[in-house]
Amino acid sequence: MKGVITMTNIEKFVDMVKNSDNIVFFGGAGVSTESGIPDFRSTDGLYNQHYKYPPETILSHSFFMDNTEEFYRFYRDKMLALDAQPNMAHIKLAELEKAGKLKAIVTQNIDGLHQKAGSKNVLE
């Protein structure tokens, strides 16, 4: 069946990682949601919740300039997760980097969890 993850597929993936020394990881919000960081576009994401203004408006430069207090209120309440800790994905990626297999992490995340897990070459 197409798209089904089987042990054979997982074993192939593990084998690819074991035999690779030039891995670049591309990631986004899904990596940090397990750590309690909200995403934007899922059913429960910030873009699907109801606010006085749409989140994409609140997070714009012009909104920040015109409504600084409202911007910071949204940012503090919805985007800061000061207690968030790296999850297994962050930790394993850091381990791959330390082992010399992972060369870089390219991410849209700005939560610092990759760095907190020990990754050094993170491009946000």
What is each PLM-predicted segment?
Residues 1-124:
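Conserved catalytic core of sirtuin-type NAD+-dependent deacylases
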